[in-house]
């Protein structure tokens, strides 16, 4: 088979905000044609979508940043994307699939963008105009001009866009509808500061950290430390589990009128990867004045319940994320490991080569609050945010009693043999931290490493137990890297 990608009208383009005088650059080449060994051709056509904005912002408050404007970092781009319109069998001259779209109605970005006061030269116009950008939704997919799949969505400017129904219509006119239901509590507005370490809603509003006054006051060391601790506490997860489930999928109702219900609970961890990414430590932050960090943020599936059309429970799968499970207690210490240390307040000593060679101080002191914590390696090293070493799956009745024993799944996780590895060599690697005290280590969250993320999260064993906790069956899994 031969796969052909790209083409002027089959490519996404972008235009960097900081390089607005540049020409648009191609960033994604979509599949345009498939040719079989027999010469049969399938062609994909696309249509232009409305322009979009993509990017991120972060802040760093440092004692050396005397002007609050210098502490802001932003990286945005203008996107010119395309969307799939048709799939055509060129050889047989027939349309295999058609895709139809329309503008969506959903929660927009605030017209008074929270970050505009932190720009060097006043508000950035395209930020304040971001609410005017149109986001399309997929309305229907038609297969062979015979089978029609239709999609309906929420239609409100006060909530995120969510799929409500999927309806299949056959050539004979028979319809089958799947309905999706969500938790009714709404997420807050965009860029308002209501999020935990993993980006989930936790109800804490720390948007005042984006104000000019905060940046001006935070150049004082004592205030900066106090603000840094408060910021850290506000990034903790929602222990109660109400806010973190906002607008999450709650249930699916099938054409038979049966349904599947999803029950969630907050993530709970017992360990976290140290800030220098060398060890696994207990779930506590490395400086005083901060609480236990066993609730880092986000949520996990707790139960999956299936009901018939009369609302009678058919099956229930209950998941336990613990190291030591017994049929009687069903609890214990969490097997969860956070892939980073959620540290936002830093006191650094950075090695200064030039000064040390000229009789000056060897280290340069820097104190800072950083909005991105100690996770700069999220995108090339961390793997998952949280890894669970053991997950127990139980089939239970409506009273929570085991029906046919339970199954223990063991996964590879941070620890011996699965930590990221040192680079072969690195320049200027002298690094230490004043706050919290940690002197002389050559490692930091920013030290390059060889990632072992692909080794983590792999199923190592699957054990089936009876009611009394006796092993009935055990499977072991081994993996060999293709190359290293």
Residue ranges and their predicted role:
Residues 1-484:
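Conserved catalytic cores of ATP-dependent inositol ring kinases
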